[in-house]
């Protein structure tokens, strides 16, 4: 009897580059391609092992002199929103969230462009074109969805794509043990809505409804202001050399009780 074995993934190492989070540090990444019939399975395994997905690439930091990037996942079934998070939910009660297959639109790109121009003018994504955005959304071999968040208007919910202004969107992988937030963006003019927080809360709600345990938020870097928000969602686990361990919010040097 002839049997065919699936080739093991090949891993590669990037050249050193300036770290986007910590000054004077250099970053390197180890990566592999997520293609073929086992792409979804490999994405699950690698994400659970601290990798992140970007298009058809799974990567994780492999820096020579630094271990500051820590993988974070929320324990969705145990999560209870704080008072401030409940206020965010109330503020955004006029938003309707709709899940679609991972397909880009010009409306999405327009909002994405506004977000980049406001938040990441000097970042590596700052010059992304509409084609780059389309590739970011569509180039996936796993179960990827895009969730649109729109201001609710009369008639919303009666059509396949609800009416109302697009305020935010999230590119999300559906995994065997939860949801992984690949990339999210929002209208930067609506700071009072805390749309980034609202999208994470919505992903926790969706994960609970699916009966799954985890929402993956990517990497947290202690001391990086860009990353501080991630430790507000408790309880959560951090990936350590000993495996996933529950994180004590006091270690972040912040008060998360409000």
Swiss-Prot record:
GO-annotated cellular components: cytoplasm
Q: EC number(s) of the enzyme?
A: 2.3.2.29
Q: What is this protein called?
A: Aspartate/glutamate leucyltransferase
> What domain of life does the UniProt record list for this protein's source?
Bacteria
Give its localization.
Cytoplasm
HAMAP family assigned: Bpt
Q: Which reaction does it catalyse?
A: N-terminal L-glutamyl-[protein] + L-leucyl-tRNA(Leu) = N-terminal L-leucyl-L-glutamyl-[protein] + tRNA(Leu) + H(+); N-terminal L-aspartyl-[protein] + L-leucyl-tRNA(Leu) = N-terminal L-leucyl-L-aspartyl-[protein] + tRNA(Leu) + H(+)
Transmembrane helix as a keyword?
no
Give any GO molecular function from the UniProt entry.
leucyl-tRNA--protein transferase activity
Keyword Acyltransferase carried by entry? yes
Organism in which the protein naturally occurs: Rhizobium rhizogenes (strain K84 / ATCC BAA-868) (Agrobacterium radiobacter)
